[in-house]
């Protein structure tokens, strides 16, 4: 199930990014004062941990976020 959740998170992030009123684009501009472009955004699964999705935001100065999915 974790694989499906990871796929949904990645898909949702990309859908928001390409959407007309993107929370990611607005948030990036508000936090960093820059325009987020397609070259500056990536969401991908970890190559070493099946429960992790990484999100890289920002061109040259990448801000990396780690999303960990755990069952309870």
Regions found by a protein language model. Give the residues of each.
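Acidic, low-complexity intrinsically disordered segments
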Residues: 2-9, 13, 18
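Short acidic DE-rich linear segments
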Residues: 71-72
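Acidic, low-complexity, intrinsically disordered interaction modules
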Residues: 13-64
